[in-house]
């Protein structure tokens, strides 16, 4: 991936943007998150994975009404979710977006069958060379797009009473495209109207992160309303520490058994800067990837947490990252700087 701005120059740019922001929270819907089964107080979230896919058709053609072998899907995913729940997990944020597999009716069956609180999303996925961005979005304004997402928040998704708990967006590699920036502006407008947090697939792309932070500043929205998704891919941890120190949420969402030590080392960098309160952990797993076998999402409770506890982290540290941080990151409220 080529970048036109060096990472050495990117860090002061991020610092300049972020230090200009001072967060002001509005009381709108404060203390609440929308789950598949309705609004709940954030205190009920408990141990939470903030970036998983319970099913997806990612890789297939875009589809506004995705089809699955529902019997096969449910017979595979529900037992696995029961296993996840037995490991102490109470809540999962499902990041499968519209046009590549979101089906809130199936998510409700999963939630009702397992007791896991599932949170779905609104928004469009702008990565994968914009493959899953609907054609009309290229012609529409940011305001017109935001109205669709705000309507899902106010009225429900796909004719149901299910409302989104966050906005899912994504940037391609390299310099941000016009459609990616427009979708992000639509996301900001949605946040200002609804208080939903913006979870944005950004990865190891400092240019995209900087552009997003510039736009947040232009609209007087705090970085605390923004999650840097797939941040574990970022090579320069100083960029993440800089973003976190000014309020942004850092999603380390590629955990697996084979990278436990890498995760411990990275988390320890945040601890050394008193920034454990800005980390989110997950796996980016998938319960039914294009109808295939499960891409598992159990490494955090089975491998990472035990290793953390034998490497100097405390139960309080683990609770901060897996319980308290998701509540604070996704509690519905507008977060502005004026």
Label every PLM stretch briefly:
Residues 51, 92, 191, 250, ...:
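Divalent metal-coordination and catalytic microenvironments
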Residues 109-112, 117-119, 123-193, 249, ...:
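Active-site gating/metal-coordination segments in enzymes
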Residues 188, 192-269, 279:
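Catalytic pocket-lining loop regions of alpha/beta-barrel enzymes
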Residues 199-201, 253-254, 275-294, 318:
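Short acidic/histidine-rich active-site segments
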Residues 4-7, 17, 23, 30-37, ...:
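Mid-to-C-terminal alpha-helical segments outside catalytic/metal-binding sites
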Residues 53-55, 97-98, 123-127, 172, ...:
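Active-site beta-loop-alpha junctions enriched in small/polar residues
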Residues 58-62, 104, 130-132, 208-214, ...:
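Histidine/acidic-residue-rich catalytic or RNA/ligand-binding cores of hydrolases
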Residues 46-50, 55, 60-117, 143-162:
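Alpha-helical scaffold segments that flank or form the walls of functional sites
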């Amino acid at each position: 991936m080529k970048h036109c701005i060096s990472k050495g120059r990117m860090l002061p740019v991020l610092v300049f943007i972020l230090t200009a922001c001072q967060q002001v929270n509005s009381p709108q819907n404060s203390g609440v998150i929308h789950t598949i089964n309705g609004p709940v107080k954030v205190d009920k979230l408990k141990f939470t994975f903030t970036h998983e896919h319970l099913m997806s058709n990612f890789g297939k053609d875009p589809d506004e009404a995705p089809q699955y072998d529902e019997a096969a899907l449910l017979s595979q995913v529900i037992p696995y979710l029961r296993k996840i729940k037995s490991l102490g997990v109470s809540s999962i944020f499902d990041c499968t977006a519209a046009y590549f597999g979101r089906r809130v009716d199936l998510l409700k069956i999963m939630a009702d069958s397992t007791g896991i609180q599932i949170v779905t999303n609104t928004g469009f996925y702008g990565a994968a060379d914009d493959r899953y961005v609907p054609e009309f979005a290229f012609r529409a304004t940011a305001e017109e797009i935001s109205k669709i997402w705000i309507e899902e928040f106010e009225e429900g998704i796909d004719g149901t009473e299910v409302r989104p708990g966050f906005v899912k967006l994504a940037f391609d590699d390299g310099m941000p495209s016009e459609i990616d920036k427009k979708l992000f502006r639509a996301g900001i407008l949605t946040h200002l109207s609804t208080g939903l947090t913006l979870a944005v697939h950004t990865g190891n792309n400092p240019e995209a992160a900087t552009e997003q932070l510039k736009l947040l500043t232009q609209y007087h929205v705090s970085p605390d309303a923004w999650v840097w998704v797939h941040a574990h891919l970022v090579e320069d941890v100083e960029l993440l520490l800089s973003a976190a120190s000014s309020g942004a949420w850092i999603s380390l969402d590629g955990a697996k058994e084979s990278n436990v030590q890498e995760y411990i080392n990275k988390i320890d960098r945040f601890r050394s800067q008193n920034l454990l309160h800005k980390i989110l952990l997950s796996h980016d797993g998938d319960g039914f990837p294009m109808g295939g076998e499960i891409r598992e999402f159990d490494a955090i409770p089975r491998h990472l947490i035990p290793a953390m506890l034998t490497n100097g982290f405390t139960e309080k540290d683990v609770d901060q990252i897996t319980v308290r941080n998701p509540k604070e990151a996704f509690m519905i409220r507008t977060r502005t700087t004026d």
